[in-house]
């Protein structure tokens, strides 16, 4: 049927993005080009969606000192000074473990972008003017099993990864609140001193 065309083409497999900040940027671009209502997207929503996508694409590390979440953060360039993580070694191990290459399997950016768009439409329908990471997680959870591109045998593992992302979001949200409260306390102190001086 298309022999002449097929003779002149060569398939090149290209892996998904493995840095979740870059993945989040893909979703932002998709939303800018999508026909969805403009609304406030709460902090961490895109990053946590990206983190979920990356977790489904990377191979679980062999050693006990680096977990899957730490590996995803290391790939993103987030290594604490005290951590002894060799990103190059992690990538080599991932390549050896993967069927073709690390990043060739997992949830697609299209699936995640579509679910974010659905979550926005759902929030609009419910009269909300914002999109929270929790509603994005709920959409992932509800639709993982029913999506044709996600093999049934991966669903339970992906749901486990989603729980890791929920916990990471919770920690980041708590840290944001701590930071905001600490800032407000200092600001209150300065304003109080300024008031007393004048």
Where in the sequence are the language-model features?
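A short helix-turn-beta junction within AAA+ P-loop NTPase domains corresponding to the substrate/partner-engaging
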Residues: 1-16
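Detector for Asparagine
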Residues: 6, 33, 63, 76, ...
């Amino acid at each position: 049927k298309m022999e002449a065309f097929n003779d002149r083409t060569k398939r090149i497999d290209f892996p998904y993005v493995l840095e979740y900040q870059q993945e989040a940027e893909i979703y932002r671009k998709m939303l800018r080009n999508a026909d969805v209502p403009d609304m406030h997207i709460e902090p961490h929503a895109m990053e946590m969606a990206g983190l979920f996508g990356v977790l489904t694409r990377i191979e679980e590390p062999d050693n006990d000192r680096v977990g899957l979440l730490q590996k995803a953060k290391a790939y993103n360039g987030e290594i604490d000074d005290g951590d002894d993580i060799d990103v190059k070694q992690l990538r080599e191990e991932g390549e050896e473990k993967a069927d073709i290459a690390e990043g060739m399997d997992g949830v697609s950016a299209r699936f995640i972008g579509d679910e974010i768009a659905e979550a926005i439409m759902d929030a609009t329908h419910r009269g909300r003017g914002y999109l929270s990471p929790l509603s994005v997680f709920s959409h992932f959870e509800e639709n993982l099993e029913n999506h044709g591109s996600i093999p049934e045998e991966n669903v339970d593992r992906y749901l486990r990864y989603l729980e890791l992302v929920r916990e990471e979001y919770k920690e980041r949200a708590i840290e944001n609140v701590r930071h905001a409260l600490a800032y407000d306390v200092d600001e209150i102190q300065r304003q109080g001193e300024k008031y007393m001086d004048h």
